[in-house]
């Protein structure tokens, strides 16, 4: 009974009382002595493929000036130095007409959002919606004034460039990184990763 694990998904994380709810889960685990033990503790489950890996490459809720300098030095461009908005903030900005373009890299934004109707109205307020996706989903049915759906290869498909098979990595909710490669032929040679 001391090996307790509590799992939760994005719905709880993004709930208006999300911080308080998760804090109580943590308190329960602390009371039961289930933090810091193998096969016990917290397990925030992410709804989209490799979303956990976003943190590893520097996607954060704040601007890290040192990281921006390293990006500028190594990649040759100046990244933004002003904070953007998170998912809830972006939905509000679209709904209020303050965001004109919605660009979605994978995922099913509309169905993952906590308030589907509010999110749909926000997306429809945009001048342009661009979705880069491996497969069609319900979010593609709700568009701005102009809409683009751009296909990309999925992780089950071969990614070949200059005759060489490329690999990718996926980080799971436990922070484990796995190297992998696709085995299926993409639908067209023009579809890129």
Per-region residue spans from a language model:
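Non-catalytic alpha/beta scaffold blocks inside enzyme catalytic domains
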Residues: 1-38, 45-193
């Amino acid at each position: 009974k001391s090996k307790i694990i509590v799992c939760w998904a994005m719905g709880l994380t993004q709930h208006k009382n999300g911080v308080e709810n998760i804090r109580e889960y943590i308190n329960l685990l602390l009371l039961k002595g289930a933090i810091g033990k193998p096969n016990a503790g917290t397990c925030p489950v992410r709804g989209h493929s490799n979303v956990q890996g976003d943190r590893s490459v520097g996607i954060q809720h704040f601007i890290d000036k040192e990281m921006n300098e390293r990006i500028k030095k190594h990649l040759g461009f100046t990244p933004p130095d002003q904070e953007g908005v998170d998912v809830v903030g972006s939905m509000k900005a679209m709904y209020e007409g303050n965001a004109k373009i919605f660009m979605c890299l994978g995922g099913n934004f509309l169905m993952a959002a906590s308030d589907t109707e509010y999110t749909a109205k926000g997306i429809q307020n945009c001048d342009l919606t661009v979705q880069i996706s491996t497969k069609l989903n319900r979010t593609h049915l709700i568009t701005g004034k102009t809409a683009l759906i751009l296909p990309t290869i999925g992780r089950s498909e071969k990614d070949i460039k200059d005759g060489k098979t490329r690999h990718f990595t996926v980080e799971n909710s436990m922070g484990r990184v796995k190297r992998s490669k696709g085995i299926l032929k993409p639908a067209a040679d023009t579809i890129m990763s």
